From Swiss-Prot:
The gene is oppF. Keywords: ATP-binding, Cell membrane, Membrane, Nucleotide-binding, Peptide transport, Protein transport, Translocase, Transport. Its main location: membrane. This is Oligopeptide transport ATP-binding protein OppF. InterPro entries: AAA+_ATPase, ABC_transp_ATP-bind, ABC_transporter-like_ATP-bd, ABC_transporter-like_CS, Oligopep_ABC_C, P-loop_NTPase. ATP binds at G46, E47, S48, G49, S50, G51, K52, T53. It catalyses: a [peptide](out) + ATP + H2O = a [peptide](in) + ADP + phosphate + H(+).
Length: 308
């Protein structure tokens, strides 16, 4: 199904280590590979410290990778410099996890949203600039009265909408949403996700949606990658990963998702993942268990998974 679609982002055998050579070095990404196809939402899920945010930042070249290659529209991101890097920044944007920290508290909303327009010279004059900002506010469900306010005057959900408007201002092809709802109240989370889904369908955007909530990732994503200890352990369609998880870590994540039905919640069996198998020294690689469903496994483990 995905083979005939255009690859927008290709992550190939990427590794990244922080504090390399020091006593406190951390291998944040360990030989990770995946593709993101044009027009899809690729969900990346895992617990805190799994490396999912680091992957997102590496794709935007906010971190320099140690090994491997990241391509965007066929161009290697690590080789981009000067004008080519400047143009890439316009095509790929990020929605940050903390809407409060990611907005300049001393700038008005009008200027926050218009900053990308100014940097990339996408407007001709002040009237054009104001009209464009107003259109973006309308798009995310805010109004013109908000233009002259500061970030601290808004709720968390409204601030995240401002962050979304800022990301959309330069008309990107690709947006990395780094846990965009984790800092929001539960009642607001669905509103923001529905807004992102609506904008994605209307504008043909491609998302990398990073989160730790598997049920929310399933709701918005076409395909899901599951990360643990810097490695991707499972990739498949959202339905396959959610309803037919194969890797023990994915199964443990899903077993922790609460059930709204109290009867089912009492019957739910929690699966505790034992990572000791990952430390046995054996080489593991992504292997296709069912069509389009890949799991990090040895050859023997893959055979066992296929029999289940």
């Amino acid at each position: 199904m995905t083979e005939n679609r255009k690859k927008l982002v290709e992550v190939k055998n990427v590794s990244l280590t922080f504090n390399k050579g020091k006593a406190n070095q951390v291998k944040a990404i360990d030989n990770v590979s995946f593709n993101i196809y044009e027009g899809e939402v690729f969900g990346l899920v895992g617990e805190s410290g799994s490396g999912k945010t680091t992957i997102g930042r590496a794709i935007l070249k906010l971190y320099n990778i140690d090994k491997g290659e990241i391509d965007f529209e066929g161009e290697t991101i690590s080789k981009l410099k000067g004008k080519s890097l400047f143009n890439f920044r316009k095509k790929a944007q990020m929605i940050f996890q903390d809407p409060q920290a990611s907005l300049n508290s001393r700038m008005k909303v009008r200027d926050i949203i218009a900053e990308g327009l100014d940097v990339h010279k996408l407007v001709k004059n002040k009237a054009d600039r104001d009209a464009k900002v107003q259109d973006l506010l309308d798009l995310v469900g805010l109004n013109k009265d908000h233009l002259t306010r500061y970030p601290h005057e808004f709720s968390g959900g409204q601030r995240q909408r401002i962050g979304i408007a800022r990301a959309l201002a330069v008309e990107p092809k690709f947006i990395i949403a780094d846990e965009p709802i984790s800092a929001l109240d539960v009642s607001i989370q669905a509103q923001v996700v529905n807004l992102m889904q609506k904008l994605q369908h209307e504008q043909g955007l491609t998302y990398l949606f990073i989160a730790h909530d598997l049920s929310m990732v399933k709701y918005i994503s076409d395909r899901i990658g599951v990360m643990h200890w810097g490695k991707i352990v499972e990739i498949g369609t959202s339905d396959e990963v959610y309803h037919h998880p194969i890797h023990p870590y994915t199964q443990s994540l899903l077993s922790a998702v609460p059930e709204p039905d109290p009867v089912l919640e009492r019957q739910r069996i929690h699966k505790v993942y034992d990572p000791v198998d990952e430390l046995d020294g054996q080489e593991r690689e992504m292997r296709e268990i069912t069509p389009g469903h890949f799991v990090l496994a040895t050859e023997e483990e893959a055979k066992a998974y296929k029999k289940k």
